[in-house]
Amino acid sequence: MMIDNKEILKSFSGSAPLFALPNFVMFPKTAYNFNVFEPKYKEIISDILKTNKLFCINLKKDNSKSEVNNIGTLCYIIESKKLDSGNYTLIASGIKKIRINDINKTKSYDIAKLDLIEENDTVTEEQLKRKKLINKFISLVASSNENINLNIIDTSMISTEMLTNLGSLILPLENEDKQKLLELNDV
């Protein structure tokens, strides 16, 4: 399913509910399946499904209950299903890198005031860099313990930015290292 990020961003008001996660970094132009079972996050999903389906994911800082990294990703719910238990399964797509300006507690969850971060996604010598990146990505994934079918990735349809972010998302890196990759200014 192709989504139009520019169209989705038209409904962005400058703030979004905050998913502060202790062990996950989301990247723009990637998608991820979530099982939502905590009451606070179920309330967020219930609320945003009634509006623009936007929320932001930020990695919690080490051993912190409430402090989050300033840089995260604005996400859009592509697909969701409410289970009989009240839990949700959903697929979210990373839309744009964001910076948190302020956090307001309005309900049982936080709403973050956000700035969209414009990235330098111009890649010089695009084809050569893509080829090197694809080869490195395939060798790293093949050498990991992950059981990933690399044939499902159509690299001809993937931008260099998307490929870089996909690699950052699925490679077996520490979350702090993934956060550092998310905070980089360009591909």
For each predicted feature, which ranges?
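N-terminal low-complexity, acidic/polar interaction/targeting segments
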Residues: 1-187
